[in-house]
Amino acid sequence: MQAYNTQTGIVCPLDRANVDTDQIIAKQFLKSIKRTGFGVNLFDDWRYLDEGYPGQDNSTRVINPDFILNKPRYQGASILLARRNFGCGSSREHAPWALSEYGFRTVIAPSFADIFYNNCFKNGMLPIVLDEEIVDSLMKATFANEGYELTADLERQVVITPTGEEYAFEVDDFRKHCLLNGLDDIGLTLQQSDAIKEYEQKMMQKTPWIFNEVRA
């Protein structure tokens, strides 16, 4: 997993509350067993005027010119500014996969659905909770200034505006450690590989019949 320390990027304002995971990545795209290929269908029902399906050539589809991600000024955005309860609805890790593959590494909102919030950390993304008044202010600044950028500093736990204002955010120490060091669940397990091998050796001596059955 790619480590996260500090990110500066163009902000895309998604001025909608209660954006659920089916809106982030629609159910028809969940059939793939891979973790890749979802970015092109991020917010599919909003980005396109025609219905999408897996394996479709999106270059032939009808773009919705009114949707925020399709506006030229937000091309290349890597920080998503959202409203309360972002990522609600059904549990699907495909949602952060789609956001990440599209190019978003940071999502800022007044609140997140718990499962989505946890899944972000497992996939190298930083979900930042800021007060609704602060999000309102950032929304206004983003709409008013083309190319508006923010900096998210995980080490210091602050969001920094172009004029130097800093907004502190909370993050669990363990999650912070994992992001700073690029550790997902597999990476954390591999860090304990010596201890795991030592445990297995002890168990092979204590209960050898279990391992015999496994080998068989």
From Swiss-Prot:
It catalyses: (2R,3S)-3-isopropylmalate = (2S)-2-isopropylmalate. Gene3D superfamilies: Aconitase, domain 4. Pathway: Amino-acid biosynthesis; L-leucine biosynthesis; L-leucine from 3-methyl-2-oxobutanoate: step 2/4. It comes from the Bacteria. CDD domains: IPMI_Swivel (cd01577). It is an enzyme of class 4 (lyase). Heterodimer of LeuC and LeuD. Keywords: Amino-acid biosynthesis, Branched-chain amino acid biosynthesis, Leucine biosynthesis, Lyase. Catalyzes the isomerization between 2-isopropylmalate and 3-isopropylmalate, via the formation of 2-isopropylmaleate. GO terms for cellular component: 3-isopropylmalate dehydratase complex. Belongs to the LeuD family. LeuD type 1 subfamily. This is 3-isopropylmalate dehydratase small subunit. InterPro entries: 3-IsopropMal_deHydase_ssu, Aconitase/3IPM_dehydase_swvl, AconitaseA/IPMdHydase_ssu_swvl, IPMI_Swivel, LeuD. Its EC number is 4.2.1.33. It comes from Psychrobacter cryohalolentis (strain ATCC BAA-1226 / DSM 17306 / VKM B-2378 / K5). SUPFAM superfamilies: LeuD/IlvD-like. HAMAP family: LeuD_type1. The gene is leuD. One of its GO terms (molecular function) is 3-isopropylmalate dehydratase activity. One of its GO terms (biological process) is L-leucine biosynthetic process.
